[in-house]
Amino acid sequence: MNNEKVRIYELSKELDLENKDILEFCGQLSIDVKSHSSTITTEEADKIRAIATQKRPQAPKAQRPQRKKKQEILSVQHQPQGAKPQASKSESADANHPTSTAKKLERPKLQSPPSRGKETPAQPEESPANNGAKAEPVAKTTSPKAEPAAPAAPKPKLMGPPPRPTPKSSAPKTPDASPATAETSSGATQADVRAKSLSKNTAEAPAKAPKLRPKPQIVGTVSKKPTPVQAIEPELDEEPDTNNVEGDDDATPEVLLAPPKRPAAKPKKAIGPKPSKRKVWEDEEEDESESKKTKTSKLKRRPVVIDDDDDDFGTTTNNNAEVPSVSLSIARPPKPKSASSSPSPSKPSPSKPKKPAAKRSGSGGSGQSQKEQRRDRPDVKTPPAEITLTETMTLREMADILCIAETDIIRRLFSKGIAINITQTLDYDTAQMVAEEFDVKVIAPEVKSAAEKSTEMLDVADLEHLQHRPPVVTIMGHVDHGKTTLLDSIRETKVAQGEAGGITQHIGAYHVDIEHNGKPGQIVFLDTPGHEAFTAMRARGAKVTDIAILVVAADDGVRPQTLEAIRHAQAAKVPIVVAINKMDKLGAEPDRVKQELSEQGLVPEEWGGETIMVPVSALKGENLDTLLEMILLVSEIEELSANPDRLARGTIIEAHLDRARGPVATLLVQNGTLRVGDIIVAGSVMGKIRAMISDRGEKVTDATPSFAVEILGLSEVPAAGDEFEVYSSEKEARAIADERAEGKRQSRLQQAMSSRRVSLSSLSAQAQEGELKELNLVLKADVQGSVEAILGSLQQLPQDEVQIRVLLSAPGEISETDVDLAAASGAIIIGFNTTLAPGARQAAEQEGVDIREYNVIYRFLEEIQGAMEGLLDPEEVEEPLGRAEVRAVFPVGRGSVAGCYVQSGKVVRNRMIRVRRGDVVVYDGSLDSLKRVREDVREVNSGYECGIGVDKFSTWKEGDIIEAYEMVFKRRTLAGRTS
């Protein structure tokens, strides 16, 4: 504190005040502090010390009278009958004793303790000059008792006396002293001794508690305060139990009359009381007394001792003027007896409401009590009202989320015909069903667009090393609107001629060198497919792009994939540049295109919007320079940058399995520099880069930001769209890859289980309709993106009656292993833009495996749908034949014959008829007899009359309508039953 700065909490310790009191003084003195850890200057500290001696917070003032009553009642019950007359005195003295008085007595005691003789009562009277300000409050407390006590009160009895080795000798003198002297001196010694004993207990109680239980002893203690004093520890064992300390204060008035019964040789030195915590101490004391009543535990718990210490200071102040030190020392020993042997009947009543808290906080530190505390702590969780399921989870995780037992979930699922164990993973649908079974609402997670950028490639460390990078431009739009042709015109190549069917079916990444403002520059173009099946590819292209070029044909306008491309670009939050293509055609209507785009929120600049629209002709190469200039202009506004001086990060654009080179992946480097020999992790795939090839087929040694290259050296084909990162440590990279691979494996197993899982209800339904049909497929494609597109298209096919099971889907050529798998499972091999390995076709012919090859996704989907329909059993449907009206009824034998006129179609013998009378069908069955002019005929066409007879129906009436129909078998479709 002699330094230039003083902390608030140090000042509060010095003044024996709480931190909040010091903060109040700071507020009054306009000293800017934030908390108890704030620092102030020594001058400001002096001001606070000055005001602290004059004015202290009086918040606890109103609490003292109430608490004093509690102590009085409790003390009366615990102590002998002789204490009652003294209780009234203590009550009046406490009521008249202000809160500020207690606080004012704190500091002088500790900082300037007077030396005194062995006799405790007489010693406080020897040093009245140390703190005249504090003697005045003491006089107030003693004044109700007697006039002779008033002169003794001004003397600083409560000021901390120096430690003395032999306080016991003063104890016998205390009972012999005059009443006035005993009361006044005991007020000081009582508070002194108790506070000191409590502070002593904080440090030494754990070791001395067992010794002091049978008999109170005087032990020298070192107080928390600067001045060391000696304290009596008659019940150190009880002190951690706050009720003992409180009991002393409560019982102090009554104990005064019974000193002869106790060994009164234990005077207590007064230490500055802290009345501000008295209320807390009293509550804990009551709790502790109740806990001791039910169970004896003498071990100390330090947190409680600290609270008792502080609170005890406050309570002793109230009884300062009345209680001699001898009576206090006598009062403390009986507490353990009442707690251990026979609890006093009076104490439980006020502390009963706090009994549970008492057991937990201060009943002792024994292992048995801790076990009881754990048992008494029922950790019962209630299920949440609603949960959000974002991914698959194990049954145990689901049980934790729902706060229910795993066995309950297993039981519920088993009752629904789903057998599962505790380690299995629940798919989303099953988890949702489980939650609903337990009345927990499931909130569907917010579906994020696949084009939304989820990962920030730049780190904080990169911000100081950023450099400009070329823009990545994605060409998007509807199929056949000229995206690849536009890119060809820019690159002056012929990519589109090599596309099957003239449509792009994978992403191509290309670099274009251009000159802008006299400086060479580069643009990286990503060409995405426009067919509806390649939504994932378009989303992936938009996710990694900086600028999106939306190609719209001037003669076709906005189409479905155009709208989807707009949504992808908006989800990725990238600027859009519209290229209105095919301006060289006669039917070009650029204004109509602009109008349609305006309806989608893309208003051209010439119309007052912010979207750049450039009319171009990809075939003739018209206006391409303007388009490139606009791209560079937008890229300058975007301020594209990256840090090339770090390990590379980026995204997998495409991946496939090459027959000669193995797994090949096309990467877009988004940050850092990729080099040959780097350890790379892409999703769950790890590898070491053996070679890198540019888009023009040239080998390169490194790839800077915004460059797309093909790499060789991966362990397997990664998933397109996965992000990759280069690691300096192969061990770290392998650990990350293995962890991701395990998660992917679990997910794949769960999907396989969910696709094969059947419930009891579904089994019964299949038993009624026949076995559920399955179409097994082995799918091989050229690149990973094509595999994704095909799988997505297959999932959109209706599979209510025929289920598609893809046993294997991977990029690469068709091998003999694939043929063996198809032969064992009765599957069809689908090859998309791929070839057959040597020996695969011969093996397929020997095994009788059907291999279908496609290069356009349209035909593939049509044939797959036809194969699924071929597995369906033909359906018998009703086909109408004709309609006739009954105009006469002729009785024949026992029955009758209807004379009819065929109104439409024809009526055929041995076919089915339905007789309607009004809106009611009176007969539905076979037509047994058909005659025309008394001759049996096979059929009668419309416009002719005929006679119709039925063996099982003869109640014809004129006006009946006869509907003729027949049942025929027709091929069923996946859309539904044929009608």
UniProtKB/Swiss-Prot annotation:
InterPro entries: EF-G-like_DII, IF2_II, IF2_N, P-loop_NTPase, Small_GTP-bd, T_Tr_GTP-bd_dom, TF_IF2_bacterial-like, TIF_IF2. Residues 234-252 have a biased composition (Acidic residues). Residues 54-63, 139-150 have a biased composition (Low complexity). Residues 151-166 have a biased composition (Pro residues). Its main location: cytoplasm. Residues 502-506 are annotated as: G2. GTP binds at residues 477-484, 527-531, 581-584. Residues 581-584 are annotated as: G4. One of its GO terms (molecular function) is GTPase activity. The keyword Protein biosynthesis applies. It comes from the Bacteria. Residues 617-619 are annotated as: G5. It holds the Pfam family IF2_N. Residues 477-484 are annotated as: G1. PROSITE patterns: G_TR_2 (PS51722). Residues 314-328 have a biased composition (Polar residues). GO terms for cellular component: cytosol. It is found in: Cytoplasm. Residues 527-530 are annotated as: G3. Residues 468-641 form the tr-type G domain. NCBIfam families: IF-2, small_GTP. Belongs to the TRAFAC class translation factor GTPase superfamily. Classic translation factor GTPase family. IF-2 subfamily. One of the essential components for the initiation of protein synthesis. Protects formylmethionyl-tRNA from spontaneous hydrolysis and promotes its binding to the 30S ribosomal subunits. Also involved in the hydrolysis of GTP during the formation of the 70S ribosomal complex. This is Translation initiation factor IF-2. It comes from Picosynechococcus sp. (strain ATCC 27264 / PCC 7002 / PR-6). The gene is infB.
